[in-house]
């Protein structure tokens, strides 16, 4: 067993951190493409809740399409059906941010962390001024 195999057994994102550089991960994190970079900026929104990755991947509501559709996150529907606290936080963002900004929110993986790619100044201001202590926000 090599170091990447050991890291993958600890968590799907660990091999990405092991490399120490930007990478693009596919599959469950085991397929890494070298030196992926983007000029995008991101706003990370993390609700102060715990979501079990194992619970989501074992959900009866989870289905995987044979053809990759990069416009959607196939874990979102399962997460909304499996975790009431996440559902409350997720739809709470819609009322705070409005439909336009809410549509830009994507999951970062199988947990509760979400992000907005290339947020504009107004969106950043709204998020920092309206989101209370139930989220951690990183820019």
Indicate where each model-derived feature is located:
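ATP-dependent small-molecule kinase catalytic core of the GHMP/sugar-kinase superfamily
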Residues: 2-104, 117-139
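Glycine-rich beta-strand-to-loop/alpha-helix junction loops that act as flexible
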Residues: 107-112, 118
